[in-house]
Swiss-Prot record:
Protein's recorded name: Eukaryotic translation initiation factor 3 subunit B
Domain RRM per the UniProt entry, residue ranges: 46-130
Reported function: RNA-binding component of the eukaryotic translation initiation factor 3 (eIF-3) complex, which is involved in protein synthesis of a specialized repertoire of mRNAs and, together with other initiation factors, stimulates binding of mRNA and methionyl-tRNAi to the 40S ribosome. The eIF-3 complex specifically targets and initiates translation of a subset of mRNAs involved in cell proliferation.
Free-text disruption phenotype from the record: Extended lifespan in adults.
InterPro entries on file: 6-blade_b-propeller_TolB-like (IPR011042), EIF3B (IPR011400), Nucleotide-bd_a/b_plait_sf (IPR012677), TIF_beta_prop-like (IPR013979), WD40/YVTN_repeat-like_dom_sf (IPR015943)
Subcellular location: Cytoplasm
Length: 725
């Protein structure tokens, strides 16, 4: 009997013919399944490369692996690790790790980078994605040749001047050519070039601007290919830093580091092609210490401000505002932190920024690693200003204030005090244009932190008029607040007394017009109140060392736009430079600290005037007492030197004029002899008329003419007849 499979008999054959090739891809057939397939990029995001682990042999590899696993499992118990073996069976000093997700891997990088495994081993952690971006070493790399030391001479030669004269540099046009010159300030005389004429003054010395280093050791110039530092008595080239199209430069406080910035030539909104626009160099060696991406630091392709990095006084730390984060709609939120870097490793301190919500600005103390910050207010959160101790990150003192529209901070040079100015509104309204209008008036306050007091005391000073400017006496206990408006600005001098809860008003000086800035002399005691970019151009010179501040002089420099004290506080300069008000006579004027004019120079297209800074010198208490004890003798010596110099200058002028007159007499005698020799010839040419004959005195006629210079009406005395009538 034969079995028949009826189903098979009726079923159609769907088999592919021999040699058939299917052209339908899996992406079309099962896209929902392939979407879940892991990619290499996702895997790399979860992997972290760690270098710096101990190099051990095969006998100790197992123990090392168990210790490393304990360290890593503190961050994530699900971590997987692999130690690449060496040919001998030991390890190579590197570790490969895989984490649960990208967030865990990023946290591991921040936590393990710089982690001290023991006293001899410190980890360096990088994600696999970052490792792929590293360029391979060049096949043609060779060991750099040892460079000879470039000796430019004594960098502080100018400090050895017997009269302690200050120097300054100016940038202006000379015969139509941009020129930079370094001059020595000669009290009572015109400034002299500080060196040979061909070395101390040069045409096209810089392509944009020049800058002194903080201690005055170097003069820096900007060029298309980079930065050049000049030093020594001959202003020789000391260092060169290659940075194409560099725009801005800045020094660290002790001249150890130089920061340069060049805007990226090509970049998109994601910051591509821009990885080293911000660079930090070692000034002494010329080594590039660190390069930053502007986009990674700020979230933008351009810097928001300059200088961008703020340095601590000892250069151990430098900081900038953290890049703003974005919400789900890619909108920028307010900045909520400070990125603090260590200059020893040029890495972010503890691998993460310091979180401070809505932070607007910050400044380092001039004498300690204390950081002052200001966080702006929102509708729900008040503004906060306070002090942060680094590296402990302890908040020494803070205060919160509602409805703050504007704020500024002012450190005292001694670092003992910090002043915060705040403008506080009652109510605000938003206009259709988006502008903010403050309704109900504003109040103005100055809050002062006393850093040297226990628990950092805080005092408040309400101001009766709008705030304009503020400045501290650098070493004393006084400060000046400029209040009012452009029509009437009043400088007020206050003093902080011991055990007082508020500053005491010492003097309220005469009000002036268009005053907009106050400047204490670097050594304190004297104060300058400036009316910059005004038609009057007044400057008040005020002595604040007395029990009551006293104005000593008022000077005028119409339309000046810059004013500077010299580093010693002996001289003050006012300048009218390019970029100021149109119509101003460009040039500078130098005054004594009391306001007596010493020098006036008009220059074509004056662009810059900068005093040469002096390095800080700390004298012992014994030396200070010795100087105070001999102050009268020293002052008498300087007065005699000034008098001798004036006499010497007068004698030099007289001698110079005598030489000029003698040379003129020689030329006149020679021309007179030539004139007498050709007199007969001239008479014959004039038909016998001697037009050069001297006139006889008898031919002159004396005539007197009386001219009334002025007239006035007076009542004539009455006669006897008029009196009788």
């Amino acid at each position: 009997m034969v079995e028949i499979d009826f189903n098979k008999e009726n079923e159609e054959d769907f088999s592919d013919p021999p040699g058939f090739v299917d052209d339908v891809t899996d992406d079309v057939l099962v896209p929902d399944v392939l979407h879940k397939k892991p990619t290499i990029d996702e895997f790399e995001d979860n992997c972290v490369f760690i270098a710096g682990i101990p190099v051990v042999g095969a006998d100790r590899l197992g123990k090392l692996q168990s210790v490393l696993k304990k360290v890593l499992e503190r961050l994530d118990p699900a971590v997987k690790l692999y130690i690449p073996p060496s040919p001998e069976g030991g390890c190579l000093g590197v570790l490969l790790t895989e984490w649960a997700d990208q967030r865990s891997a990023q946290f591991a990088v921040k936590s393990l980078n710089g982690y001290a495994f023991d006293k001899n081993h410190t980890f360096t952690a990088r994600s696999f994605k970052d490792m792929k971006q590293l360029e391979a070493p060049s096949d043609h790399w060779t060991t750099p040749e040892k460079q000879a030391y470039n000796d430019v001479g004594d960098l502080w030669w100018w400090l050895q001047n017997e009269r302690c004269r200050d120097q300054f540099a100016i940038s202006h046009d000379k015969l139509g050519v941009p020129t930079v010159g370094v001059f020595t300030n000669m009290k009572g005389n015109d400034p002299e070039l500080a060196g040979d004429a061909d070395k101390a003054e040069r045409a096209n010395w810089t392509e944009t601007v020049f800058t002194w280093s903080p201690h005055g050791s170097y003069l820096s110039t900007i060029h298309k290919q980079g930065i050049i530092l000049w030093g020594g008595k001959d202003y020789a080239r000391a260092h060169r830093f290659a940075h194409t199209n560099v725009q801005y430069i800045d020094f660290s406080p002790c001249e150890t580091y130089l920061v340069t910035y060049a805007a990226p030539e090509e970049s998109n909104s994601w910051g591509d092609c821009e990885k080293d626009s911000l660079r930090i160099w070692d000034v002494r060696t010329g080594e590039l210490k660190k390069a930053f991406s502007t986009f990674e630091l700020t979230g933008r392709t351009q810097l928001p401000t300059w200088p961008f990095f703020r340095w601590s006084f000892d250069e151990k730390y430098f900081a900038c505002l953290k890049a703003p984060e974005k919400d789900k709609l890619e909108r920028e939120q307010k900045i909520n932190g400070i990125s603090i870097f260590e200059s020893e490793k040029f890495e972010l301190y503890e691998g993460r920024p310091v979180n401070i919500e809505n932070i607007k600005q910050f400044e380092w103390s001039p004498t300690s690693t204390v950081l002052a910050y200001y966080s702006e207010c929102t509708d729900a959160v008040p503004a906060e200003f306070g002090l942060l101790q680094v590296p402990s990150m302890q908040r020494l003192r803070s205060a919160r204030v509602h409805n703050v529209a504007d704020a500024q901070m002012f450190w005292q040079k001694s670092g003992k005090r910090l002043a915060f100015y705040t403008m506080r509104f009652k109510k605000k309204e938003y206009r259709e244009t988006g502008e903010v209008k403050y309704v109900g008036g504003c109040q103005y306050h100055v809050d002062i932190f006393e850093i040297d007091k226990k628990d950092v005391s805080l005092m408040n000073l309400p101001l009766s008029e709008p705030f304009i400017h503020f400045d501290w006496d650098p070493e004393g206990d006084k400060f000046c607040v400029l209040v009012g408006n452009t029509a009437k600005a009043t400088p007020q001098v206050y003093k902080i007394e011991a055990n007082s809860h508020a500053p005491k008003l010492v003097s309220k000086l005469d009000a002036g017009v268009h005053f907009n800035e106050v400047q204490f002399a670097p050594k304190g005691g004297w104060l300058a109140v400036l009316a910059k970019v005004s038609a009057g151009g007044n400057v008040y010179f005020i002595d604040t060392s007395l029990s009551e501040a006293k104005r000593t002089n008022v000077i005028e420099h119409p339309l000046f736009n810059k004013g500077y004290w010299d580093p010693t506080g002996r001289y003050f300069v006012t300048c009218s430079t390019l970029g100021g008000r149109a119509g101003a006579d460009l040039g500078y004027r130098i005054f004594t600290f009391q306001g007596r004019e010493l020098c006036r120079k008009n220059l074509d297209r004056l662009a810059q005037f900068k005093w040469r800074p002096r390095p800080p010198v700390k004298l012992s208490e014994q030396k200070q007492r010795e100087i105070k004890k001999n102050l009268k003798k020293t002052a008498a010596k300087f007065i005699k030197q000034d008098d001798d110099e004036k006499c010497r200058a007068s004698q030099e002028v007289v001698e110079k004029r005598r030489k000029i007159m003698a040379a003129f007499d020689i030329i006149r005698s020679r021309n007179r002899e030539q004139l007498d020799a050709t007199r007969d010839e001239r008479i014959s040419l004039r038909n016998g008329v001697d037009t050069e004959a001297q006139l006889d005195e008898d031919e002159f006629v004396d005539e007197e003419i009386t001219i009334a210079l002025s007239t006035s009406k007076t009542q004539a005395p009455l006669t006897e007849e008029e009196m009788r009538d």
